Swiss-Prot record:
SUPFAM superfamilies for this protein: MurCD N-terminal domain (SSF51984), MurD-like peptide ligases, catalytic domain (SSF53623), MurD-like peptide ligases, peptide-binding domain (SSF53244)
HAMAP family hit by this protein: MurC
Gene from which this protein is expressed: murC
Species whose genome carries this gene: Mesorhizobium japonicum (strain LMG 29417 / CECT 9101 / MAFF 303099)
Designated name of the protein: UDP-N-acetylmuramate--L-alanine ligase
Entries under Pfam families matching the protein: Mur_ligase (PF01225), Mur_ligase_C (PF02875), Mur_ligase_M (PF08245)
Catalytic activity from the UniProt record: UDP-N-acetyl-alpha-D-muramate + L-alanine + ATP = UDP-N-acetyl-alpha-D-muramoyl-L-alanine + ADP + phosphate + H(+)
InterPro entries tied to this protein: Mur-like_cat_sf, Mur_ligase_C, Mur_ligase_C_dom_sf, Mur_ligase_cen, Mur_ligase_N, MurCDEF_pg_biosynth, UDP-N-AcMur_Ala_ligase_MurC
GO biological process entries: cell division; cell wall organization; peptidoglycan biosynthetic process; regulation of cell shape
Length: 466
């Protein structure tokens, strides 16, 4: 049964969140009555207002109005006045993932999961399906540059969604195709152990119907091990390794563009086909791997090699994923969401491959708990940066932890052999350092999930003004 239009006004608590805003937008486009509230005004909130969705700033019980259904994310605390008022009124409370699952019932669905690369891969799958004329509906965890939003309403039968594993609710999503990019020990505060993370991803793939399939990256040891544990469901593997069903080869860089070929092997017949001369306007082996996942999905859904090539070459990227924010005297500045050591390492490796100049990394660690749990990994993930500049930890509401600081991280980076690691107190120190350090051809890469994105956009202007 699909969700009836008669459910009444749907109120989103935290409507400006990247996950919530996309669901609200698609619900609105489907003809449901939608409103919401958020702690602060934002670009997402304004975008929803522009589409005719009423958005309140601040959380108050009276914001509910005539709402008959309330949608919440896991970030909303039980003490939230709107949530308390909704419970007093005995209104149904719907988790974000539950509402996403309801939307997915309107379409056949591709869900992209994994510890890293979900947002970019979701965008790539959407781009290829659009290029192939499938006109997909899309709900993503980041702003897709081609759309200027994280959601898109299509008329086709396919929906492409990002599956967030952080709180386990991705297991509620009724996907026909489940993509797994990689699995790392993240979100242990929710799962309790890495074994439970592994088990969740196994369920994610096995939840697809018998006519569906999983798409899994066997370049990642954890994912390869998981492939062997999947029972009674078809799996298509991808990666650079020779055993992958969909394999990228001949990867080379042309400036900031990745060029490569893909060999597709049919496991049943043993036959092979090749798509040659693929061009992706992004650097980095990790992005080529993400593109290969999208190609595996697109090929399975019947897209031609030409449609895949055309779609990939037009891919405009995702906001905060190696986004170019400006230039100064031949120095290019980039903003990236990377905040886990695996992501940071991949981004810096991509930057290194795309320039003959130096790579200057400016990092803002995100959460004391993450830095504490992954201190050794953070200390060793900056090797592809010639200079590392570390800002204070972005707490994201957490209390400090003794011995866990950016100052200590810099000490550990240096102790590991890095030749130029520095600590700064805040953003005002950045422009003078870059002015004295950077030369034409260098890349400055901002990394973090906090407010460092504002610094990345401010720096080119600050340098130009001096």
């Amino acid at each position: 049964m699909k969700m009836p239009q008669t459910i009444g006004l749907v109120h989103f608590i935290g409507i400006g969140g990247i996950g919530m805003s996309g669901i609200a937008e698609v619900l609105h486009n489907l003809g449901y009555k939608v409103q919401g509230s958020d702690q602060a005004d934002s670009a997402n909130v304004q975008r929803l207002r522009d589409k005719g969705i009423e958005c309140f700033v601040g959380h108050k019980a009276e914001n509910l109005g005539d709402a008959e259904v309330v949608v919440v994310s896991t970030a909303i605390k039980k003490t939230n006045p709107e949530l308390k008022a909704a419970r007093e009124k005995l209104l149904p409370i719907v988790r974000r993932a539950e509402m996403l699952a309801e939307l997915m019932r309107f379409r056949q669905a591709v869900a992209i999961g994994g510890t890293h690369g979900k947002t970019t891969t979701t965008s790539m799958v959407a781009t290829l399906l659009e290029a192939g004329g499938l006109d997909p509906t899309v709900i993503n965890g980041g702003i897709i540059n081609a759309y200027g939003t994280n959601a898109r309403m299509g008329d086709g039968e396919w929906m492409v969604v990002e599956a967030d594993e952080s709180d386990g609710t991705f297991l509620k999503l009724p996907a026909d195709i489940a993509v797994v990019t990689n699995i790392d020990p993240e979100h242990l505060d929710h799962y309790g152990s890495f074994d439970k993370v592994r088990e969740a991803f196994r369920q994610f793939v096995e939840n697809v119907p018998f006519y569906g399939f999983g798409v899994m990256c066997t370049d990642h040891p954890e994912v390869q091990a998981l492939v062997g544990r999947i029972e009674d469901r078809r799996v298509i593997t991808y990666g650079e390794n020779a055993q992958a069903d969909v394999r990228f080869t001949n990867h080379r860089m042309a400036g900031a563009t990745s060029e490569f070929d893909v060999v597709i092997r049919d496991r049943k017949t043993g036959s092979q086909s090749t798509i040659s001369g693929l061009r992706l306007p992004m650097p980095g082996r990790h992005n080529v791997s993400n593109a290969t996942a999208a190609i595996a999905v697109a090929h399975e859904l019947g897209l031609s090699g030409e449609a895949i090539k055309k779609g990939l070459s037009s891919f405009a990227g995702v906001k905060r994923r190696f986004t170019h924010t400006g230039s100064w005297n031949g120095v290019d500045v980039f903003d990236d969401y990377g905040h886990h050591p695996v992501e940071i390492s991949a981004v810096l490796k991509a930057a290194r491959s795309a320039t003959k100049g130096r790579v200057i990394a400016i990092a803002q660690p995100h959460r004391f708990t993450r830095l504490h749990d992954l201190f050794n990994e953070f200390s060793a993930c900056f090797n592809d940066a010639d200079t590392v500049i570390v800002a204070p930890v972005y707490a994201a509401g957490e209390d400090p932890i003794d011995g866990v600081s950016s100052d200590e991280l810099v000490s550990r980076i240096r102790a590991g052999g890095h030749r130029d690691a520095r600590y700064i107190e805040g953003p005002t120190a950045i422009a003078p350092i870059i002015r004295g350090l950077a030369k034409p051809g260098d890349f400055v890469v901002f990394l973090g999930a906090g407010n460092i994105t504002q610094w990345a956009y401010a720096l080119p202007k600050e340098l130009a003004a001096s």
